[in-house]
Amino acid sequence: MKPRNFEIFKKRLEEAGMINLAYDFMMASGKWSALLYRADIEMNLRTPEWGGFQLLDLQDYPGQGSAYVGILDAFMESKGLIAPEEWRHFCSEVVPLFCTEKFCWTNDEALTGEVEIANYSESDLNSKQLSWTLTDSKQQVLDKGVLPLQVKQGELAKVGTLKPAIASVRKAEKVTLALSIDGTPYRNDYSLWIYPAADKEGAPSEDICVTDDLDAHLKYLTEGGKVLWFPSKDKHKDQTVGGLFQTDYWNYRMFRTICENLDRPVSPGTLGILTDPGHPALADFPTEFHTNWQWFPIIKQSYPMILDRLSDDYRPIVQVIDNVERNHKLGLLFEFKVGNGKLLVCMSDLKAVQDKPEARQFYRSILEYMESSAFAPSYSLSAKDLQDLFTAKVKTGEMKKLFNISSYK
């Protein structure tokens, strides 16, 4: 008995020149998947008179074209994506919940949210209190407090409103709101992102050209200029894939077949991002190596570029993970040296989401990088190679249909 499907997937990734990224792809897509499972579970727990949920699936399923969507592998063993005790923070008989309108705030706003307790244990939670703390990335306490609890068994109870102070956060910061019921193992925590309100409209310095028409500024670039290019989505449909915030579910081939048979739009089929949090382009945009909620407007407006023509050792600053059927090298943010100039390419329409503080901060972080000495692309492309990358037909392998017993009509 051998995992023949894994052998096929490995060969495909080797042929795509990305086998060295296999573990990173698994961890980045898997950790993001765990956060998505958490969001779905908490959505259920926030629902009054909720009757339970069935999780499809806690473990990988090797059938139906291979559905490696589990937090555990096919043998019910950990894949290293999330610790069991962390999973129980949001999937337990008692779960503290923080209900808020958004995860990203500016420091001049009043961060507000409701605390609720889902109590499906065997007894009431009386004469107890919930402690909360808001800490920054260095574990410094920004604010804290307590709420009294009187929660009946089987009840979803609103226990109070939180308005943690965030005005003291002066730079872009990921903060953590921790909730815990004193004298019990029940706790939960939430990542929030705080951005400075000042300079809401990030502006480039005079030597940076920001454009959606590179042809008009190609001479400036090749002669030594710095260009931030937002390629037109409509002009490069054959060289890009759609933006997908959540991971593609089950497997791409099966649901692509279903959608095509029903004449419905096919999912972009991607699995989140992989990036280096320490890259200087992200110095003022706190992130993990995988997708999290602060990326939402950026990815929703994205159209990742297919970079298969580039050498195997080329890595985008922000790479989008493709599915095992296609294995494209996809870029959301990437850079080149072109002639004597420096080019940074962003495959997201940030103008469309400048009302979102996280999108403004991402743009600001990019500009700060381009203004610094750290902006020194090492991968050289000629103007002709750059044009081919954005206009030439992309080679794609044959993908056979995968029919399901249900027609889904």
List each model region and its residues.
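Substrate-binding clefts and catalytic carboxylate motifs of secreted carbohydrate-active enzymes
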Residues: 1-134, 314-316
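Short amphipathic C-terminal alpha-helix that caps PH/PH-like domains
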Residues: 359-371
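Flexible loop/turn segments at secondary-structure boundaries
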Residues: 60-67, 141, 235-238, 352-353
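Low-complexity, Pro/Ser/Thr- and charge-rich linker/hinge segments at domain boundaries
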Residues: 193-213, 377-378
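Catalytic beta-strand/loop cores that center a nucleophilic Ser/Cys/Thr
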Residues: 233-237, 254-357, 374-409
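Short beta-strand elements
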Residues: 148-151, 185-201
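Short alpha-beta junction capping motif
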Residues: 205-253, 265, 340-346, 366
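Beta-strand-rich binding/interaction modules
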Residues: 108-150, 157-165, 172-182
